[in-house]
């Protein structure tokens, strides 16, 4: 019986000694992580804390303190390493690391780090998309800005830049929809300007192609986003080509109202006068011929017509 007690005591002593050895080993691993962290070797520190955590959890109650400390360091280090990836423009790996950080931080009860990592993801996606746009890789830029908007649907800047990328890629209709989204999310001034420019360029191209009816239609869409002298000029020229002189007069007059000092104002006035003269409206014809008498090319003829109409 005495021999049995001695054997049991030896076993218990051995277990206690092994436990002490395990705790010492885990503590040493944790301390190695702390030393690496002080030396700003984040990857080595992270690995040490992970190993220390795994060992501490096997120790149960004895390892709780070290495990708790490891859990406080690991998400913060993951986040810091992810931010370094962002600085190195390693955007895809950065996003993956940030997502891993969020999961770990939530698991370990670090809500602040989880929130910070989540807030950073749209910014990283934006940087990636911006880099693609600057490189004129419009397909990648479009994908990038769509990813930003998936994470942050109310991001007006992302919608605005998505519109720019789509417009540069030649997808005008989709660009307009993106600009409308931007306008609804704080970027109205710039978005409206971009939409107006798209319609204006379309109108000019249609006028050049002699597609006069659609040129008028596109030009008038410009003015839905703010009156534009050039749009009225295109609408007027297209209407004149369609022999819709009343419309041409109306649009030319709006052009002169918005751009009274334009370089071609006297020439436009001469055209309006001639159109009124064709309609038999002498008073209006004289009014606009008088605005054209200073024109170097048409001034003499304008004066001649005034004299004839009086």
Which role fits each region the language model picked out?
Residues 42-43, 91, 138, 172, ...:
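TPR-repeat structural position
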Residues 62, 110-111, 117, 158, ...:
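TPR alpha-solenoid repeat register
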Residues 2, 6, 13, 17-83, ...:
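N-terminal leader/linker segments that initiate helical-solenoid repeat arrays
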Residues 57, 106, 153, 186-187, ...:
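Short coil turns that delineate tetratricopeptide repeat
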Residues 52, 101, 147-148, 181-182, ...:
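Canonical positions in the second alpha-helix
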Residues 38, 76, 80, 87, ...:
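Register position in tetratricopeptide repeats
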Residues 66, 73, 80, 117-120, ...:
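Canonical tetratricopeptide repeat
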